[in-house]
Each structure stands twice: as structure tokens, then as C-alpha cells.
Amino acid sequence: MSCLEIYNKDTMKKKEGEEETRDGTVDYYGRPSIRSNSGQWVAGIVILLNQGLATLAFFGVGVNLVLFLTRVLQQNNADAANNVSKWTGTVYIFSLVGAFLSDSYWGRYKTCAIFQVIFVIGLSSLSLSSYMFLIRPRGCGDEVTPCGSHSMMEITMFYFSIYLIALGYGGYQPNIATLGADQFDEEHPKEGYSKIAFFSYFYLALNLGSLFSNTILGYFEDEGMWALGFWASTGSAIIGLILFLVGTPRYRYFKPTGNPLSRFCQVLVAATKKSSVEAPLRGREEMYDGDSEGKNASVNTGRRIVHTDEFKFLDKAAYITARDLDDKKQDSVNPWRLCPVTQVEEVKCILRLMPIWLCTIIYSVVFTQMASLFVEQGAAMNTSVSDFKIPPASMSSFDILSVALFIFLYRRVLEPVANRFKKNGSKGITELHRMGIGLVIAVIAMIAAGIVECYRLKYADKSCTHCDGSSSLSIFWQAPQYSLIGASEVFMYVGQLEFFNAQTPDGLKSFGSALCMMSMSMGNFVSSLLVTMVVKISTEDHMPGWIPRNLNKGHLDRFYFLLAALTSIDLVVYIACAKWYKPIQLEGKDEMQDMSDDDYDTESEEEREKDSKV
């Protein structure tokens, strides 16, 4: 009997070791992923390191780009801020390109690899063009030595390089986040918990990667060593690419699922063609569910989505008419006349997400000020500490440290306390709650920035012509506004990553991550538009305006207070949209979640603590 027990135990261990994932992931060769030797934190940490190195490279260019434009290319403050906003916005618009190619054709891994190569080429081009053509005389572009004029060809080469960087980083970014999440099976209790934790650590890696850029590289570039900073960024991107490729055998993969745009259009066309069709008497029972075995509930081969009652016009795409019955008998269903319920629900999911997504744009307008007006404001303050000068862009280190602190506080203090006191059936602090908290903190951050600017103007020399460091107010007074923005990011952007990834269908996960990037993109473009409008209106009657080249003659504080007011209005609209929103429901997911919760509760406290510390 004891031999039989030993045999059974060995058999069970072998089965556990060869257990396949439940979410449909495959290995590099297209075989079902084995849980024990794929994905999880081994692959997750490789992806986090890759993200940190790529972010270091990106912000090595982006963090001081506004100063490069003003000091090297001789642009004024408003034009430089607008150009940075447009460039940053373009980065995140390219995220849609990457998400589309990933979900439709290439898959997440191949898309990440290709766009990282483009990213490296763009950084190399920028480094070469800066070293050979733009930084003349050598060492120019600091606070003292002006740079010479540049030809149209040189400026064109510069813009070509930075927009190639935008394409590479933008196309890569949403897919690396989703590829990282793919390494954890959400239908497994322990891995599902790790998947939620991954998004927090992903955003932490993003910020820690930019910490080096904002401090060491920021200092070199502020001192005029622009080419050195750009070459360091290039080296970081190359190391990150090599590390990413090394992890290839360990990753879990989802196969690309076809063009999501065509699926979206098929539902709209089919619903329009059947606009005069009456609802079937038996309702949901007479709607098309795919084939008789239910395997093709959606052409994306993902999990079924539970039917909902919103946007009932779209349901007509799944109504089965006499003509559709004839087509089914001939085994030739026309996807432009008849769509499965899950395909219809995919469209509904995206439509429900849109109001929430639109409400996040104003927050991104606030966030983008760190890379533009915060830097210009800091440059006009006292940056000296003894004989050492603080690079204005390095003040964003307070933002990064704040992100790290609040991620720790949220995951180890706030979340456990909230879960302890939540009522039965309650989900505790949801992603929507966290995003709302982020908006509140953003309002406070803009008020703090406006107050600091009021005092900066009070101690400023308004008669100066070269106004860097013209105010006696220490640059460290900017620390509160940077720290508040960092705290708001933990609630808003980490919440967004989790929310859009969880609320998009299986075949649109990269698109979900791209929505978060697109929020940043639209925020940058709206910021650029807002700055342009404010400058035009405030400079009427020959007034210097709110954001002139000499900030001591302007009123940047009023612009910050305007942003605080706009964010407050956005918060009210967001609350209304969040109350209206209904989350996606996957068939069988509730039952699976209940089982997962039971399994998870049986884990020892030691195992849970170990997982939370990864």
C-alpha cells in the first residue's frame, strides 16, 4: 500500500510539473505552455529589466529635450514646450500602430522585437547627428555657451531621428506591458494575483529606468555633454534588446487573432443591414453563438463574453434571419451579415470604455507639464547648492521616488487594510476608484505648482535678459508638485494599465494597453493646443502673456490654476461615467474566480508573502 501511495504521489508531482496553462498561451514552437518551465516571474523579471533599460534610453532623450530645443536649436519657451508635447504625443499615437500589428498579424513578441530595433536605429541616428552637426562648438548648449546656427538639412536630420525614436518606443511600449502580463495565467489563483502585482512593478520599472536619465544623464546634458548622454541612451537600448531576446525560450505567447478593425466593422455593417429586423421572440436564445459546439463564439478564438443589454442596436448583427439559416445549412456564414454574440460584445466593450478613456486625457495634460513647463519653471529658479548646480530636469527624481514610495504603500499598506474592511461581495478599491483618486491628487499638484510660481515671481529679477536662475527661490520648492504628480500616477496610470487590460476582450489586450498610451498622447496634443490658445489670448494688446520667453514677465501660475480648474471639472464628469460603466463578464469566469479564491485562501501565509515580495 505504501508503494502505491509513493507511486501516486510521484504521478501527481509529474502531472503538476507538466500542467498546461489554462488561458491558452503557447510556447515559442506553438505548443501549449507548460506552467512549470515557462512564464511567471522568471520571464516577468526579464521583461521588467528590459522595460527599465528601454525607459532609461527613451528619457535620456526626452527628459531634457525642451532644454535641447531652447539652448541648441534656439527655440523660445512656448515653441519648445509645444514641440516636446507634439513629439511625446506622437510617441503614444504610434502605440496604436504597434497594438494593431500585434493583435492582428505579428503577435506581441515579434512586434516588441521589431520596434526595439527601430528604437535603437533612431537613437544611433540622433547620437551621430548631434555629435557631428548639432553640438557646435563643442560643449555648447549649457547655460553659458550658445550654439551656432544650423542648416535645414541638420534640423531635418534631428527631427527624423527623434521621430524614429518615437516610432520605435511607441510601437514597443503597449506590447511589452501586455507580453509581461501574458506570463501570468489569470485563471490560476497564485499567478492571477501575480499578474495584478506585475502592473505595479512594471510602472515602477518604468520610473526607476528614468531615474538614471533624470539624474546622471540629466546632469551631463545640462552641462552641454549632449552627445555623451545620447550615446549612453543608445547603449542602454542595445543592452535591453539583447536581454529581451535572451528570454525568448521562456516566454509564453498568445497567437495573433486577426484584424480587430475588420471585426469591429463587420458588427456595424451587419447591424445596419438588419436595422429593420425585429428582435427574436426568445431573445438571447435565438442569437448566433458561433458553431454548434460553441468553439467559434468569436472569430478571435478567445473566451466567450456574456451578453449585455446596452447598445441593443448592435445585437441585430447576431440575429439569425431566414437568409442566415440558409447560409448556415450551406456552411457558408457571411461575417458581414451575421456575427457571433461575443464579437458583438467586443464592440460594446470598446464603446463602454470610451467615456472613461476620454476622462483620462485631462489628467495626461497635467502629467505632461513635468517634461516641459515644470523644467522651464525650475530653470528660472535658484538651482545652486553650494558650488553644485541642480539640473532642472533632475527634479523629476522626486516624481520617481514618490512613485516607488506610493506603490509600496498601496500594495503593502492601503490594499491589505481595504481588503480587511471590505464588505462581503464588495471588490474593495477598484481600478475606477484609484483613477478617481489620481485625478483628485492631480488637482492638488497643480494648485501647489501655481503657489510655488507665485512665490518664484515674488523673488524674481524681472529686468533680466538671460533669466536662468534669476529667482532667489530654491528649485527644491518644486519637490511637492513633483511628488504629488508621482502619487497621482500610482493611482491613475497603474490603475489604467490594470483597467484597460482587464476590460478588453482576449483578442484586444494590446489595444487595451495602447488606450493608456493614447491617453498620454492626446494629453500632450491637448496640452500643446491649450498652450497655443493661452499664449494667443494672453498676448493681445501687446501684453507679454502668461508663458513668455522671460517667465519673470509672465504668469505661469495662472496657467497652472487653469489646469487645476479643468481637472476639477473632468473629475465630476469622470465620476458620472464611472457610475454608468459596466465591467466585462466572461462566461465561466465567475465560477473560475470563486474556485480561484477558495484555492488562494488555502495557500499558506508564507507563500502569499513570498509572492507579494517578488
Swiss-Prot record:
The keyword Zinc-finger does not apply. Disruption phenotype: No visible phenotype when grown under normal conditions. Lower nitrate concentration in xylem sap. Decreased long-distance root-to-shoot transport of nitrate but not of sulfate or phosphate. CDD domains: MFS_NPF7. Induction: Up-regulated slowly by nitrate. Down-regulated by cadmium and high pH. Circadian-regulation. Expression increase during the dark phase and decrease during the light phase. It is found in: Cell membrane. GO terms for molecular function: nitrate transmembrane transporter activity; potassium:proton antiporter activity; symporter activity. One of its GO terms (cellular component) is plasma membrane. Its main location: membrane. It comes from the Eukaryota. High expression in roots. Barely detected in shoots. Expressed in root pericycle cells close to the xylem. Residues 592-614 are annotated as: Disordered. The modification Phosphothreonine is found at T111. The chain crosses the membrane at residues 41-61, 87-107, 114-134, 152-172, 196-216, 226-246, 355-375, 390-410, 435-455, 515-535, 559-579. InterPro entries: MFS_trans_sf, POT_fam. The keyword Transport applies. GO terms for biological process: leaf senescence; nitrate transmembrane transport; potassium ion homeostasis; proton transmembrane transport; response to nitrate. Residues 593-606 have a biased composition (Acidic residues). Belongs to the major facilitator superfamily. Proton-dependent oligopeptide transporter (POT/PTR) (TC 2.A.17) family. This is Protein NRT1/ PTR FAMILY 7.3.
